[in-house]
From Swiss-Prot:
Residues 273-280 are annotated as: G4 motif. Residues 39-379 form the G-alpha domain. This is Guanine nucleotide-binding protein G(s) subunit alpha. GO terms for biological process: adenylate cyclase-activating dopamine receptor signaling pathway; sensory perception of chemical stimulus. Residues 181-189 are annotated as: G2 motif. It comes from Xenopus laevis (African clawed frog). GO terms for cellular component: cytoplasm; heterotrimeric G-protein complex. One of its GO terms (molecular function) is GTPase activity. It is a lipid-anchor. A lipid is attached at G2 (N-palmitoyl glycine). Residues 8-25 have a biased composition (Basic and acidic residues).
């Protein structure tokens, strides 16, 4: 009779059975999630502000996530119009601030500058026909163009010329941005943005983190289980200064940042894919011959193009020398302090050129796969 007190009721046995089955399902799902997690390549996009990181993410969407639908494109119209407003405001403000100042070729346009400088400064500004007329006329003034040519002396968004040239298209009521418009559109990245995509049944998670100095403290929370870092550099920024202090050379800032990441004790086993970006703008500057690299980096005067350099078809030898000099400045850092546990893989990129990014990312996939296998000690 004493044994009867330990017997379980039918309800208790059923409850325990349900609990065991539930636990099995949870364990099975955890194992499945772990497998998916381990099979996912996590890529962290780092780099100084305005280097083109967000454009790389947009390219991944265009190439691997069916791009942007019509509704998403419509939501970017206001941002693009804001880019036009910011561009013309910045240029006409700089005309009086530069030394020596820049004069209008047609003084009758002064009232248009006064109009632009008195515009309200809020995000949802309503763009009138009057705004477009004044902006277009000013953009055609040779004095405004001359000020634009000196844009390395002040802070101007890269897409200024692109969108100012498209005013007649953007102002239309039925305007829908093209993929190229979306790639060019500049919106400050604040925080951390994740993009998920799949290439040949391989899962990728790409994390885009704001590049301005006050955003970098957020980077450390992204470092856990990263497969590789993609470090993006604005190669054309050799004659510009950063927005944060209007003093530090932008390319030097990128070099310093790269060095701090390369030597970070938490990242000693994570390899870096180096995107030497904005090659189109670098070529424009070098070919124009107005801003000489040696004026900002004196060591360039002694630099010779390496024998193994592979220039693009029809590329000016001056451009080849410039881009390889910038590449080698970064490789000097990686080779000086590398201990063989991580490597630097440089690529010349143009983030607004979809075919270029398609080709470069395809070239990088084998490298990323090897890093992933090494990450889980399978190689």
């Amino acid at each position: 009779m004493g044994c009867l007190g330990n017997s379980k009721t039918e309800d208790q046995r059923n409850e325990e059975k349900v609990q065991r089955e539930t636990n099995k399902k949870i364990e099975k799902q955890l194992q499945k999630d772990k497998q998916v997690y381990r099979a996912t390549h996590r890529l962290l996009l780092l780099g100084a502000g305005e280097s083109g990181k967000s454009s790389i993410v947009k390219q991944m969407r265009i190439l691997h996530v069916n791009g942007f639908n019509a509704e998403e494109k419509k939501t970017k119209v206001q941002d693009i119009k804001n880019n036009i407003k910011e561009a013309i405001e910045t240029i006409v403000t700089a005309m009086g601030n530069l030394s020596p100042p820049v004069e209008l070729v047609n003084p009758e346009n002064q009232f248009r500058i006064d109009y632009i400088l008195n515009l309200p400064n809020y995000k949802d500004f309503e763009f009138s026909p009057e705004f477009y007329e004044h902006t277009k006329t000013l953009w055609q003034d040779e004095g405004v163009r001359a000020c634009y040519e000196r844009s390395n002396e002040y802070q101007l968004i890269d897409c200024a010329q692109y969108f100012l040239d498209k005013i007649d298209i953007v102002k239309q009521n039925d305007y829908t941005p093209s993929d190229q418009d979306l790639l060019r559109c500049r919106v400050l990245t604040s925080g951390i943005f994740e993009t998920k995509f799949q290439v040949d049944k391989v899962n990728f998670h790409m994390f885009d983190v704001g590049g301005q100095r006050d955003e970098r403290r957020k980077w450390i929370q992204c470092f856990n289980d990263v497969t590789a870092i993609i470090f993006v550099v604005a190669s054309s920024s050799y004659n510009m200064v950063i927005r944060e202090d209007n003093h530090t050379n932008r390319l030097q800032e990128a070099l310093n940042l790269f060095k701090s990441i390369w030597n970070n004790r938490w990242l000693r086993t994570i390899s870096v894919i180096l995107f030497l970006n904005k090659q189109d703008l670098l070529a424009e500057k070098v070919n124009a011959g107005k801003s000489k690299i040696e004026d900002y980096f004196p060591e360039f005067a002694r630099y010779t193009t390496p024998d193994d350099a592979t220039p693009e078809v029809g590329e000016d030898p001056r451009v080849t020398r410039a881009k390889y000099f910038i590449r080698d400045e970064f490789l000097r850092i990686s080779t000086a302090s590398g201990d063989g546990r991580h490597y630097c893989y440089p690529h010349f990129t143009c983030a607004v050129d979809t075919e270029n990014i398609r080709r470069v990312f395809n070239d990088c996939r084998d490298i990323i796969q090897r890093m992933h296998l090494r990450q889980y000690e399978l190689l």
